């Protein structure tokens, strides 16, 4: 016997006797906080877990001073819309956060939940919809509910973390194709088709309508067209497309005019709706299957009434005020064209999500963002290693309907000034010590 268990028949016993049990909590204590947590002393409260204060919008306070904020998915500006705030308040006063008590299958069903589902399904062009308590949890639950160990999944390599976590629960075979590479998708579909002939299962293809980091679109129409050659069920996560893409904001599948070819459509309330919760929609038999088999909804409390009442008002505003979406796209086009005119790399975004790509390490990224926030009073999100490859920086800008063209012009000028400093090497210094622990020490 060789390898892990040694070179003799007794090697198995010998090496098992010498395996040292590890305490889980000690392992966590000794691993320096994980790939991102290792920076906690530098990042917490500033680069990670920053505290933005005030009404949600383009102007908020960060550490006591006003900043121009480009870091919220409040696409249509509904978070502080007076009618939305009023609906949220009415829901809280009339029903409270406790209502309805229990899971919907047992005691948590209301006519308002049913009305919201009917209206959502009609808006996105599907037969029925089912409310989910949270988007992240909802996607995990959809995947878990759909699949058996006999099934195969084919998914985009840049799928959101909620999709990846859902796939981790799947005990069958998984096939991944490079981001938006349709030729490779065909190859993986062929492999999956051969596999399920042996297992007696089916194939699920998963992608996103709008990819939230890069802003590019999933090639939904091309994937739907592949149904002529392959038998599969198509699941689309359209979290960033709902309310922003397609005619009347009905989503990315409508943008591509292929909604009938999307079998399972997922959307969240956390972006354009500026709320909490999510929904999945499709044919009635499928949604009924989810209602009676999705464990995260069977064994969890129903979505609270203030969120349901608030969601009804938000949907009404999306349906009746196309000018909000038009304004979003006016700001988006001005921002993205401005970056292109100044020769910034914003990749292949076709949505409001605007990534600005720069070159540099963690130190340069943190010093650049520190400069934006402290010198220019401009707040945006930064992504760097280990989330993306070493040497890359992404500054993620999210335009909204409540930003102004003056905000766009100011931001473009700020980025131009920071790029000049980056190219001169002025950000090649130690990470700034601005985490809460240092901030609090200085305040004493």
Feature map (PLM): residue ranges:
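PLP-dependent enzyme catalytic core of the Aspartate aminotransferase-like
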Residues: 2, 90, 94, 118, ...
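N-terminal "arm"/small-domain region of PLP-dependent enzymes with the aminotransferase-like
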Residues: 2-21, 25, 29-98, 232
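Conserved PLP-binding catalytic core of the aspartate aminotransferase-like
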Residues: 48, 325-336, 342-376, 385-387, ...
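Conserved N-terminal alpha-helix of the aminotransferase class I/II PLP-enzyme fold
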Residues: 86, 90-134
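Conserved PLP-anchoring active-site segment centered on the Schiff-base-forming lysine
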Residues: 142-161
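Short, structured coil segments at secondary-structure junctions
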Residues: 149, 169-171, 261, 342
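Active-site phosphate-binding strand-loop segment of PLP-dependent enzymes
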Residues: 175, 179-236
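Active-site C-terminal subdomain of aminotransferase-like
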Residues: 230-233, 240, 245-350, 357, ...
């Amino acid at each position: 016997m060789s390898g892990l268990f040694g070179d003799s028949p007794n090697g198995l016993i010998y090496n098992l006797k010498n395996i040292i049990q590890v305490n889980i909590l000690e392992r966590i204590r000794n691993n320096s906080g994980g790939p991102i947590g290792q920076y906690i002393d530098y990042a917490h409260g500033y680069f990670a877990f920053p505290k933005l204060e005030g009404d949600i919008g383009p102007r908020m306070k960060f550490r006591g001073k006003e900043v121009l904020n480009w870091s919220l998915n409040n696409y249509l500006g509904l978070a502080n819309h007076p009618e939305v705030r009023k609906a949220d308040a009415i829901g809280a006063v009339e029903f409270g956060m406790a209502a309805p008590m229990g899971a919907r299958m047992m005691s948590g069903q209301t006519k308002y939940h049913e009305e919201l589902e009917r209206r959502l399904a009609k808006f996105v062009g599907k037969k029925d919809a089912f409310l989910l308590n949270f988007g992240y949890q909802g996607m995990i639950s959809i995947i878990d509910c759909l699949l058996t160990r006999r099934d195969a999944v084919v998914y985009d390599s840049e799928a959101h973390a909620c999709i990846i976590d859902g796939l981790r629960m799947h005990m069958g075979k998984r096939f991944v194709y490079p981001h938006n590479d349709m030729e490779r998708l065909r190859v993986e579909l062929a492999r999956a088709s051969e596999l399920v002939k042996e297992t007696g299962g089916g194939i699920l293809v998963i992608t996103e309508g709008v990819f939230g980091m890069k802003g590019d679109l999933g090639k939904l129409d091309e994937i739907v067209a592949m149904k002529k050659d392959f038998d599969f069920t198509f699941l689309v996560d359209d979290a960033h497309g709902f309310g922003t893409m397609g005619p009347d904001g009905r989503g990315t599948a409508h943008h591509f005019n292929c909604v009938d070819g999307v079998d399972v459509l997922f959307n969240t309330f956390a972006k354009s709706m500026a709320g909490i919760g999510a929904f999945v929609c499709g044919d009635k038999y499928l949604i009924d299957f989810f209602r009676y088999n999705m464990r995260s909804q069977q064994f969890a409390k129903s979505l609270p009434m203030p969120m349901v009442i608030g969601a009804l008002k938000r949907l009404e505003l999306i349906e009746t005020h196309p000018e909000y979406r038009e304004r979003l796209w006016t700001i988006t086009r001005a921002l993205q064209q401005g970056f292109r005119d100044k020769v910034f790399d914003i990749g292949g975004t076709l949505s409001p999500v605007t990534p600005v790509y720069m070159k540099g390490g963690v130190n340069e990224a943190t010093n650049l963002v520190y400069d934006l926030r402290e010198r220019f009073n401009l707040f945006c999100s930064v992504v760097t290693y280990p989330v993306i490859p070493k040497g890359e920086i992404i500054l993620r800008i999210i335009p909204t309907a409540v930003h102004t063209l003056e905000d766009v012009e100011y931001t473009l000028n700020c980025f131009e000034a920071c790029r000049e400093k980056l190219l001169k090497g002025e950000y090649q210094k130690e990470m700034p010590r601005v985490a809460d622990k240092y901030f609090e020490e200085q305040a004493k």
